[in-house]
C-alpha cells in the first residue's frame, strides 16, 4: 500500500488550486528533476537520494511568491502528525514517512494532513523526505536532518561521487555507446528499486 500519492506537493500560496503544466521531467543517475509552470510562475524541483532512508528535495521558483506545501491523498490507515519541524505519517505496520522542513517554515496540522508555509523564500528551499521501518530508526535519524537541510553540499557531493563510482565500474571504452546507455539504465533501475 502507498503511504500517499505525494508526501510533499508544492504550490504558490496565493492560489493553491492553480494547475501546473509540466515543462520537463528527467531522471538522472542519483537525481529526479521536474519543472512546471502556472500563471504565477515556474517551480523547479530536484530530488537527490542522500542516504538509504532520506531524499533531499530542493525547490526553486522564478518568483519570490510565498510557497505552500501539503501532502496529497494519504492512505486510509495513515495517521499524520506534526512534531517540531517534521510531519510524521505513521502506518499501523510501524513504517513512517517524515517530511522535515527548516525552522523558518510555518508548519500546521490540518485534519489528517499538514500545511507548510514558506514566506518570501530564499532559494533553494530544502525539504527532507524520509522513510523509516521503525520508530527507533526514525528517532535515530531525525536528529541528523537539520544539518542536511542547512548544509546539503556534503551530502550532494557524496551522492555525486557514489553515482560516479557505480558508473565508472560499468562503463567500458571497448564497447559501443549503446552498451553504455543500457548499462547505465540497468544500474539506475536496480539501485532505484533496491528498497522496494
Spans of model-derived segments:
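An extended acidic
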Residues: 1-38, 160-172, 176
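Acidic/polar, glycine-enriched structural segments that form the non-catalytic walls/loops
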Residues: 42-44, 49-196
Amino acid at each position: 500500500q502507498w503511504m500517499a500519492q505525494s508526501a510533499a506537493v508544492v504550490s504558490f500560496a496565493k492560489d493553491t488550486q492553480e494547475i501546473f503544466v509540466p515543462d520537463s521531467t528527467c531522471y538522472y543517475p542519483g537525481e529526479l528533476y521536474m519543472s512546471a509552470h502556472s500563471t504565477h510562475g515556474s517551480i523547479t524541483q530536484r530530488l537527490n537520494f542522500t542516504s538509504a532512508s532520506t531524499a533531499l528535495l530542493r525547490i526553486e521558483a522564478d518568483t519570490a511568491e510565498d510557497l505552500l506545501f501539503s501532502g496529497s491523498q494519504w492512505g486510509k490507515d495513515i495517521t499524520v502528525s506534526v512534531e517540531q519541524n517534521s510531519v510524521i505519517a505513521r502506518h499501523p505496520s510501524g513504517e513512517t514517512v517524515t517530511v522535515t522542513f527548516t525552522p523558518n517554515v510555518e508548519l500546521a496540522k490540518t485534519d489528517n494532513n499538514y500545511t507548510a508555509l514558506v514566506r518570501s523564500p530564499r532559494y533553494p528551499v530544502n525539504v527532507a523526505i524520509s522513510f523509516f521501518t521503525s520508530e527507533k530508526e526514525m528517532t535515530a535519524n531525525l536528529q541528523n536532518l537539520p544539518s542536511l537541510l542547512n548544509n546539503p553540499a556534503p551530502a550532494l557531493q557524496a551522492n555525486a561521487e557514489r553515482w560516479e563510482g557505480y558508473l565508472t565500474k560499468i562503463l567500458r571504452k571497448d564497447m559501443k555507446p549503446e552498451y553504455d546507455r543500457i548499462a547505465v539504465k540497468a544500474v539506475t533501475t536496480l539501485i532505484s528499486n533496491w528498497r522496494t
